Amino acid sequence: VPVVMAGVLGIYGLIIAVIISTGINPKAKPYYLFDGYAHLSSGLACGLAGLAAGMAIGIVGDAGVRANAQQPKLFVGMILILIFAEALALYGLIVGIILSSRAGQSRAD
């Protein structure tokens, strides 16, 4: 279970990468400095949140699998803690989407 939850974090990064790459089209419109910083901040927000969530999932998953072998009643508690750790990355994805959507809004035309 922890391996699957850790794999989802990579998908969150892929989603942000696709959103950022669709916002970059220098032939259709100029790419302003604000757009670059918005895309950079959205990638960093999702990436750092994914890093923190991955570390939490790794630590909790390791301890949970070891404890589950000794006492199977701890499985539900382990899953709940893993879900809360996954929520960290989901919040980072949401913030990244919000920041990336701001990329085309500040124009000095």
Swiss-Prot record:
PANTHER family: V-TYPE PROTON ATPASE PROTEOLIPID SUBUNIT. Belongs to the V-ATPase proteolipid subunit family. SUPFAM superfamilies: F1F0 ATP synthase subunit C. It comes from Zea mays. Residues 21-39, 100-109 are lumenal. High expression in the mesocotyl tip of etiolated seedlings compared to the base. V-ATPase is a heteromultimeric enzyme composed of a peripheral catalytic V1 complex (main components: subunits A, B, C, D, E, and F) attached to an integral membrane V0 proton pore complex (main component: the proteolipid protein; which is present as a hexamer that forms the proton-conducting pore). Residues 62-73 are cytoplasmic. This is V-type proton ATPase 16 kDa proteolipid subunit. GO terms for molecular function: proton-transporting ATPase activity, rotational mechanism. Its main location: membrane. GO terms for cellular component: proton-transporting V-type ATPase, V0 domain; vacuolar membrane. Pfam families: ATP-synt_C. It is found in: Vacuole membrane. Proton-conducting pore forming subunit of the membrane integral V0 complex of vacuolar ATPase. V-ATPase is responsible for acidifying a variety of intracellular compartments in eukaryotic cells. The chain crosses the membrane at residues 1-20, 40-61, 74-99. It is a multi-pass membrane protein. The record marks E86 as: Essential for proton translocation. Keywords: Hydrogen ion transport, Ion transport, Membrane, Transmembrane, Transmembrane helix, Transport, Vacuole.
